[in-house]
């Protein structure tokens, strides 16, 4: 299968004043596991606007803005937000994404079925702007 270059720019912008320099580490391990279903339910208010994905969690007023070059990988972006919501809830277990579950939109299924991303980690620093760029070929 042709390799796809994926570029994800992740911005984390906490809205709660006073919570600065609080480190939060999110480990995203993407495997074929149905655990992703329950975790994704923690993500609310998924809004697509101008090619960007806005996700708000119930854990606090933090929202995650993800700019995606290829809109067909929106499901992967929502998985990042789900992992972040899981971290905010106090659970530090690895996040598993079921590649056969439609997390966000139907047109993302072809990418999810074709790609298995294992062991990808993102580090989030709450209270500060973080720009994380990922260039990763996926077969």
Where are these regions (language model features)?
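A general structural signal for short secondary-structure junctions and capping/turn motifs
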Residues: 2, 56-57
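Sec-dependent N-terminal signal peptides
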Residues: 3-14
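A structural "domain/chain start" motif
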Residues: 7, 17-50, 127, 131-139
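Extracytoplasmic
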Residues: 21-23, 59-63
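Surface-exposed short loop/turn segments
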Residues: 49-55, 62-109
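C-terminal/domain-edge helix-coil "capping" segments
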Residues: 91-139
């Amino acid at each position: 299968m042709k390799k796809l270059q994926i570029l994800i720019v992740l911005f984390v912008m906490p809205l709660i004043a006073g919570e600065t320099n609080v480190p939060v580490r999110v480990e995203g391990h993407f495997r074929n596991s149905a655990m992703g279903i329950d975790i994704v339910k923690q993500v609310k208010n998924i809004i697509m606007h101008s090619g960007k994905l806005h996700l708000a969690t119930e854990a606090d007023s933090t929202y995650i803005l993800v700019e995606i070059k290829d809109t067909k990988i929106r499901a992967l972006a929502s998985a990042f937000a789900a992992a972040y919501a899981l971290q905010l809830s106090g659970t530090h277990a690895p996040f598993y994404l079921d590649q056969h579950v439609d997390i966000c939109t139907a047109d993302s299924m072809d990418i999810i079925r074709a790609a298995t991303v294992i062991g990808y980690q993102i580090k989030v620093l709450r209270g500060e702007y973080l720009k994380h760029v990922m260039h990763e070929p996926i077969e």
